């Protein structure tokens, strides 16, 4: 099964839009909960679709891995207004395929937390295939370390990379206040509840970064690139909305 043949993304997206439109609110568990409240909201949507999945853990990727379909869903909640142009991806580069699973991302924006307010709405959301964020599926992140730093040579230096990735809200225009589904163009949607609202293209760069150096004396970083064997390749995507809910507002690259 490939993304071009079948996916649960349609059902999950439509359930997310139904819940958002009908006012199913995000429940904040505690004042210190800054990560899992939107994930819990998405989990309830997956449950409503009667899809079986492995329980998420703090270090699992993607967050929700379906049992009966080779798919996974990574959830990213964003306070609005706030930081919404990009997000921190700790030790994991976004991808459209991970360990044989098609990967989809669920981005949701919600109001900033206020004292005494423990529930709030989903302002807007985007469900997109991971290849819309990054087309490469071969890179494998690894944490590395070495010992020998410091006056006595016994300090360990860990290289634990943090990737800062643009969100769909920054990459495309026409998503504010609505729910949008972005899929590879070769996928044929099956639900008559979905209406196409845009065609999007992302073009691979001429040169790709392959390594970097960090000078511990000057605190300067030097990057190294090489020609991209896929330079100029255009990746085509289509954007969809629920019929009758913002389907006259087009989605375009920003």
Show which residues each predicted segment covers.
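Nucleic-acid endonuclease domains
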Residues: 1-60, 67, 77-254
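Conserved active-site neighborhood of enzyme catalytic/cofactor-binding cores
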Residues: 74
């Amino acid at each position: 099964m490939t993304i071009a043949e079948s996916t649960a993304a349609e059902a999950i997206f439509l359930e997310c839009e139904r819940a958002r439109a009908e006012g199913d609110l995000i429940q904040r568990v505690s004042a210190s909960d800054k990560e899992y409240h939107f994930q819990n909201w998405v989990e309830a949507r997956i449950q409503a679709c009667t899809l079986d999945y492995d329980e998420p853990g703090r270090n699992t990727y993607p967050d929700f891995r379906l049992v009966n379909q080779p798919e996974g869903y990574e959830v990213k909640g964003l306070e609005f207004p706030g930081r919404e142009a990009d997000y921190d991806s700790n030790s994991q580069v976004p991808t459209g395929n991970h360990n044989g699973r098609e990967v989809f991302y669920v981005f949701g924006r919600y109001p900033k937390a206020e004292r005494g307010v423990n529930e709030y709405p989903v302002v807007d959301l985007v469900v997109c295939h991971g290849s819309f964020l990054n087309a490469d599926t071969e890179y494998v992140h690894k944490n590395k370390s070495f010992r020998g730093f410091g006056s006595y040579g016994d300090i360990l230096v860990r290289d634990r990379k943090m990737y800062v990735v643009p969100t769909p809200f920054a990459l495309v225009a026409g998503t504010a206040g609505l729910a949008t589904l972005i899929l590879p163009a070769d996928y044929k949607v099956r639900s008559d509840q979905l209406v196409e609202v845009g065609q999007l293209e992302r073009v691979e760069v001429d040169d790709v970064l392959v390594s970097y150096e960090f000078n511990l004396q000057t605190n300067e970083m030097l990057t190294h690139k090489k020609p991209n064997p896929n330079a100029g390749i255009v990746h085509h995507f289509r954007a969809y909305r629920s019929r009758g809910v913002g389907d006259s507002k087009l989605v375009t690259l920003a």
